[in-house]
Amino acid sequence: MNRYNVYKNKFGTGYILDVQTDLLSGLNTRVVVPLLSISDSPKLAKYLNPTFEVKGQEVAMMTQFIAAIPESELTNQVDNLGDFHHEISSALDMIFSGF
């Protein structure tokens, strides 16, 4: 598994972003955040919900819906958002630290 890989959401609409460090690759779960199309997203909060383009669609990171799922559920990788490390880390800092 690679941090910041984006997978098709098998459980619903949009995508799933893997945000877990690769240093914990021995676990059988991954920490993930949903990526929803802007039209399907609740009101976006500055810093908490950065937006990205995935497969030509603008999506928002729904940081407030962070979860852990079995690693085996992450199949069908469609993208990697590693170039947006700062924005993703800032959103995670906002949910955990408030800044």
Language-model segments: what does each one mean?
Residues 1, 9, 89-93:
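Generic detection of intrinsically disordered/low-complexity segments and helix-coil linkers/edges
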Residues 2, 18, 74-78:
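Residues at structural and domain junctions
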Residues 3-6, 10-50:
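Compact nucleic-acid interaction/catalytic patches
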Residues 44, 49, 54-57, 64:
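A short, structured beta-strand/loop element
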Residues 56-99:
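C-terminal terminal-subdomain/extension
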